[in-house]
């Protein structure tokens, strides 16, 4: 199945503690989850590793969020939107369902 949400897409969170927040997708995981910049922050207790120069302590980092809990943000409408696929000039392109505009990659 083609990826409806890809890296560098602007998304809005639909459910969870960060509902309504917008962010940029930094990574799409094969498990059906995405990592969004500044969203779903968790505290990790990092053990120091002097050989690698890693300092210990409590570190905040982004955790994965299920792809069903985010929707692509349509800048033209200012709302969350759905994605469709169609062929144009022999290439498969993504488009917003609300206004049929092609999603820029």
Swiss-Prot record:
Gene3D superfamilies: 2.30.30.30
Pfam families associated with the record: KOW, ribosomal_L24
Gene Ontology CC annotations of this record: ribonucleoprotein complex; ribosome
UniProt GO BP: translation
Xref: InterPro entries: KOW, Rib_uL2_dom2, Ribosomal_uL24, Ribosomal_uL24_CS, Ribosomal_uL24_KOW, Translation_prot_SH3-like_sf
Keywords: Ribonucleoprotein, Ribosomal protein, RNA-binding, rRNA-binding
SMART domains cross-referenced by the UniProt entry: KOW
Example GO molecular function: rRNA binding
Protein family: Belongs to the universal ribosomal protein uL24 family.
Entry-linked PANTHER family: MITOCHONDRIAL RIBOSOMAL PROTEIN L24
Subunit structure comment from the entry: Part of the 50S ribosomal subunit.
Protein purpose: One of two assembly initiator proteins, it binds directly to the 5'-end of the 23S rRNA, where it nucleates assembly of the 50S subunit.
Record protein name field: Large ribosomal subunit protein uL24
Encoding gene (name): rplX
């Amino acid at each position: 199945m083609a990826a409806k949400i890809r890296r560098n897409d602007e998304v809005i969170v639909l459910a969870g503690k960060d509902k309504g927040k917008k962010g940029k997708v930094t990574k799409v995981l094969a498990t059906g989850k995405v990592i969004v910049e500044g969203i779903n922050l968790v505290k990790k207790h990092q053990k120091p590793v002097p050989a690698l120069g890693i300092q210990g302590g409590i570190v905040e980092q982004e955790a994965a969020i299920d792809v069903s809990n985010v929707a692509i943000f349509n800048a033209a409408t200012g709302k969350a939107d759905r994605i469709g696929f169609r062929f144009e000039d022999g290439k498969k392109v993504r488009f917003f369902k609300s206004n049929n505009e092609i999603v820029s990659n």
